[in-house]
Amino acid sequence: MDSKYQCVKLNDGHFMPVLGFGTYAPAEVPKSKALEAVKLAIEAGFHHIDSAHVYNNEEQVGLAIRSKIADGSVKREDIFYTSKLWSNSHRPELVRPALERSLKNLQLDYVDLYLIHFPVSVKPGEEVIPKDENGKILFDTVDLCATWEAMEKCKDAGLAKSIGVSNFNHRLLEMILNKPGLKYKPVCNQVECHPYFNQRKLLDFCKSKDIVLVAYSALGSHREEPWVDPNSPVLLEDPVLCALAKKHKRTPALIALRYQLQRGVVVLAKSYNEQRIRQNVQVFEFQLTSEEMKAIDGLNRNVRYLTLDIFAGPPNYPFSDEY
């Protein structure tokens, strides 16, 4: 197993590569870019590819994975692919059809990991963010424990090897963990996590429950309005990260990625730039000292780039709690 293929064992016995490739891109980026980027990522040594129904790129991502299998670069079992259930399909009877739709778009037989993407439910239908005539989001009321039972059935059916959640706080995780008749625990919780928002409390909670924390926006975030405040600080320009990058002869992005691996976090690196995709797999080639780790810990300032506050209001909105 090459060094680029380090894995963590999940609570269901499956293995997840600790470095993943994120595929989300703002709407104006042509979908063809996802196809090229995923091919480049697999060529560079990424084995873990993260997407979602709502990213609207699973056809391209699936094509990229299948083309790298077809040309002999990788086998299907060497790719760890994650998809996610969007909020318009939380009703239990809609969960499996949503996964089957992703599989059809991907033209794959199974996903390695299927996540509840976001805990707030919206009305079912084709619209991913359904709104009324006044522009108000049409929320739905769904018991996420029932959604979870439908996720468990997807695992039993072999459509997803592992199941987990994303954007859950510790209260919502407890709700699933304490569910009567729980068959499978979530293997992971994928959340925003980076040196400016290091999620220490949530990380400790997840570790105590044998749930892996997976970091998105690990390099800060895209600056896409209206999702991200354009005035928020740019993580990769941080003087501490830049000084460490200079010292290690690496990039600030690599320092931010390495930081997560050393604290036991699985990290997603999103880039559509060929040079940076190749650079990001160098995360296994160096180590940070405990002093350097402490210095990065000290950067935490609870800056959440992606507040998703258009979904605030319903009790399952996850970001009002401390963690």
UniProtKB/Swiss-Prot annotation:
Residues forming the catalytic site: Y55 (proton donor)
Keyword Cytoplasm assigned: yes
GO biological process annotation, one example: positive regulation of cell population proliferation
Enzymatic reactions: a 3alpha-hydroxysteroid + NADP(+) = a 3-oxosteroid + NADPH + H(+); a 3alpha-hydroxysteroid + NAD(+) = a 3-oxosteroid + NADH + H(+); 5alpha-androstane-3alpha,17beta-diol + NADP(+) = 17beta-hydroxy-5alpha-androstan-3-one + NADPH + H(+); 5alpha-androstane-3alpha,17beta-diol + NAD(+) = 17beta-hydroxy-5alpha-androstan-3-one + NADH + H(+)
Mechanisms controlling activity: Inhibited by hexestrol with an IC(50) of 2.8 uM, 1,10-phenanthroline with an IC(50) of 2100 uM, 1,7-phenanthroline with an IC(50) of 1500 uM, flufenamic acid with an IC(50) of 0.9 uM, indomethacin with an IC(50) of 75 uM, ibuprofen with an IC(50) of 6.9 uM, lithocholic acid with an IC(50) of 0.07 uM, ursodeoxycholic acid with an IC(50) of 0.08 uM and chenodeoxycholic acid with an IC(50) of 0.13 uM. The oxidation reaction is inhibited by low micromolar concentrations of NADPH.
GO molecular function: aldose reductase (NADPH) activity; androstan-3-alpha,17-beta-diol dehydrogenase (NAD+) activity; androsterone dehydrogenase [NAD(P)+] activity; bile acid binding; carboxylic acid binding; estradiol 17-beta-dehydrogenase [NAD(P)+] activity; indanol dehydrogenase activity; ketosteroid monooxygenase activity
Protein name according to UniProt: Aldo-keto reductase family 1 member C2
Originating gene: AKR1C2
